Amino acid sequence: MENAKMNSLIAQYPLVKDLVALKETTWFNPSTTSLAEGLPYVGLTEQDVQDAHARLSRFAPYLAKAFAETAATGGIIESELVAIPAMQKRLEKEYQQPISGQLLLKKDSHLPISGSIKARGGIYEVLAHAEKLALEAGLLTLDDDYSKLLSPEFKQFFSQYSIAVGSTGNLGLSIGIMSARIGFKVTVHMSADARAWKKAKLRSHGVTVVEYEQDYGVAVEEGRKAAQSDPNCFFIDDENSRTLFLGYSVAGQRLKAQFAQQGRIVDADNPLFVYLPCGVGGGPGGVAFGLKLAFGDHVHCFFAEPTHSPCMLLGVHTGLHDQISVQDIGIDNLTAADGLAVGRASGFVGRAMERLLDGFYTLSDQTMYDMLGWLAQEEGIRLEPSALAGMAGPQRVCASVSYQQMHGFSAEQLRNATHLVWATGGGMVPEEEMNQYLAKGR
């Protein structure tokens, strides 16, 4: 971006200056609306989420047999919700900032099959595509026992088709493993940030991995191009896919059920704050949408990004969405949080969700490493750096009197609050890689 343009952008949006300086930044969204007012802009409804829920239930008998690790839950891919009181104390001590309410962790990091939040959206979109093909070919009806998809005739049928996706790692892992199991030929276009072990794991499942020296945006573009030339190839579009988004959104109802099981209340007197790491936006956007449908105006969602990749904060704050990238303002998009190394946000998610998100913040790689170490020490839970992005949220919210006033929170409401950090990945990180992460914390 030339200087004059840059200067006028900063004049209009002074916060951009802090982003350019790679400062840890928090922006509380002044334009949030009620769910009723914001919902029409999403372009999807409660019914769409129910349909996704039903589809995953139809596939449950198949998943229970296809992946032994889902047998115990009857083929439902869901993660644990745990309290992390020792980590809460550690954060309060390290940052000299009390966190009012209770701190919880949602362990999507340990979801079965692929060990990340992408096991929600990625697997769902592959299943939705497989179902569509099988229904159209007359090989399946909605009332069938879907475990029949494991038969050789279905494998044979699906092998005529292929799937392509661009990814920094975790989405590729989910889509690759699921597609290969069903019988699709699958190609994952991996950006330069992708970890070597993720590529190796995919190849071990018979997935074709194409590697790029460039970032996420290039990998997605190349994947899209490769798929266009083949009518039997289906491209899963992380930047714009409504299907992926709906796969994530099912998490809202599931979390509501987990809260009910644990006797946790969410209402006006007991607000829920949720902190979601954000890359291109599909995962956190879909989850936030599902949470809003489940808890209405009593849930407050925040997106967390690396200081080197603040694409969603930049896009929503300036209103330019996918018309601007972090590279345009001189930020390099290089971060240890490989899952969040995205320079240009999803225009669909930004525009759909901007009224329903309470805020956005950035944190440095070092902060993620520090918190990664503390969580391992205090709670014995090991995550990858990206998954710690949400962990900085509670102190930002508790420290901001202006945010609390904007939403009229009383001290008592904050004392009764639940702070939920969404841990997005790390359950499958190899030991030696994890030790390198742990060594970087302070």
UniProtKB/Swiss-Prot annotation:
Gene3D superfamilies: 3.40.50.1100
Keywords: Lyase, Pyridoxal phosphate
GO MF, one example: pyridoxal phosphate binding
Biological-process GO terms, alphabetical: D-serine catabolic process; isoleucine biosynthetic process
Catalysed transformations (reactions): D-serine = pyruvate + NH4(+)
UniProt cross-references to PROSITE patterns, sorted A to Z: DEHYDRATASE_SER_THR (PS00165)
Annotated EC: 4.3.1.18
InterPro entries given in the database record: D_Ser_am_lyase, Ser/Thr_Dehydratase, Ser/Thr_deHydtase_PyrdxlP-BS, TrpB-like_PALP, TrpB-like_PALP_sf
Source superkingdom: Bacteria
Cofactor(s) it depends on: pyridoxal 5'-phosphate
Any matching Pfam family: PALP
Modification sites for N6-(pyridoxal phosphate)lysine: 118
Subunit structure: Monomer.
Family in the record: Belongs to the serine/threonine dehydratase family. DsdA subfamily.
Alphabetical list of NCBIfam families matching this protein: D_Ser_am_lyase, PRK02991.1
PANTHER family: D-SERINE DEHYDRATASE (PTHR48078:SF9), THREONINE DEHYDRATASE, MITOCHONDRIAL-RELATED (PTHR48078)
The protein's name in its UniProt record: D-serine dehydratase
